[in-house]
Amino acid sequence: MENTATKLRVIYGDCTLGLKGKGFHYIFSYTRGGMESLNKNGKEWLYRETLSTFWRALTDNDRGNGFEYRSSVWLGAGKYPKVKQIQVKIEDTAIELPIAPVNNQYSNTEYVSSAEILFTLEYNTVPKTEVVVSYRINALGEIKVNV
């Protein structure tokens, strides 16, 4: 039997992808477009899904030239993204999005060395803005995020 102690366990939910290893468990939501649970050594580190932010603190110069008025759409832009596309890669191979009933073809004992999930998110700005967020996880629980 293959040694699964140094592998990443993949759990295919109806609307989520779970990744579990020694001392960690992560859950990614297809409907929310991001990570919704980051549990390390029994401690939960997220209380809601991760969201992008496109705003920064205003400076005196910003206030003087009306920046806050012209750019106010960006203050709330990251709050309600629309999930346009989701791609799941298991060991660098793209698979069909494993939502019901496709996820039923997988067992609850899938072990891999790495997984990646990419979310293409659209923000309601003028013009529309799209951002691709990629989460790559290895068997040690290390997460590499690319935006």
Enumerate the language-model features and the residues they cover.
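Beta-strand/loop-rich accessory regions of lumenal/periplasmic or secreted enzymes
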Residues: 1-146
